[in-house]
Amino acid sequence: MLSLAQLESWFFIAPALLLAVLSGYLAERVGIINIAINGGMVFGGLFMALLSYGFTNNLNQSAPSWSLFITIPLSVLFSSVIGCLFALAAVKLRADHVIVGTGINLLASGITLFISQNAASLFSDTTLRVRYLFPIQTTVSIEAIGVFVFSLLLIGFVWYLMSFTKTGLRYRAVGENPNVIDTQGISVYKYQWIGAICSMMVAGLSGSLFVLSVSNFPFNSGDVNGLGFIAIAIMIISMWRIIPSIFIGLIFAYAYVFTNSQIGSNSNSYLLRTIPFIISLLVMLLFGFLNVAPKNIGKHFDKGLR
């Protein structure tokens, strides 16, 4: 069982992981391979950390919880810029999707490390950190529950949109057979741009929630503990379906929080960190034969093949 502090962390980690899976879903359903989820999360966490400094007057203060209604939306908005870069390279310039995703991951880590190493001169702080600190309570905080419920509602809305609307049908068809969509006079490129941008915005939201789970602790590693790569594994295991990904994601989030809680009291801390990734690999090996990825994933749209 999880302690109260671990449960509080789970209420932030679980939505972050589920939204990271949704980020991959949104891109790959329009045929764009998205291994940039981790980088998108790092950018979201970076924006969240930088914005949190705007609500503190000195190093002994934490940002007020009401400012989350400002910093989280702004983090998502700034992440749309990363989405535009992703779409520009993958759709407009027709670059290899895997290389583009790798580039975004490296860029995110590099920028975060650079800012963290210069935190003393930029923020008069010892290191880059998220300036939110939720007081210890006898129950899970309202902020954590609110984030969890909002994330589930957002995922439910996307599921309904993709499953029961004309827009969702067209969206998914772009990743299966874009030429059929093109013959109907519908812009394939428009849907791919929307998919890439929304994917990075959701990844940014995921990253901002992740750093809240480690609030007021250093965010100087240039990474989100590889949570974006676990999200890719969950997306594959759930066969690019939203509902199965929710249940699988909640289980993985529990395993992630539990193993991390044991790191401080165990000499084999580095080995414990690998457990979520080992589980991901084993499950992928066991259920890899069920791979039902979108048929046009990773392929650039060509009008000449109509």
Curated annotation (Swiss-Prot):
Location of this chain's protein in the cell: Cell membrane
Domain of life, per lineage: Bacteria
Main location: membrane
Transmembrane segments: 7-27, 30-50, 68-88, 95-115, 144-164, 194-214, 232-252, 274-294
UniProtKB keywords: Cell membrane, Membrane, Transmembrane, Transmembrane helix
MF (Gene Ontology): transmembrane transporter activity
One of the record's GO cellular component terms: plasma membrane
Membrane topology: Multi-pass membrane protein
PANTHER family registered for this protein in UniProt: GUANOSINE ABC TRANSPORTER PERMEASE PROTEIN NUPQ, SUGAR ABC TRANSPORTER INTEGRAL MEMBRANE PROTEIN-RELATED
Name assigned to this protein: Uncharacterized protein MG121
Native species: Mycoplasma genitalium (strain ATCC 33530 / DSM 19775 / NCTC 10195 / G37)
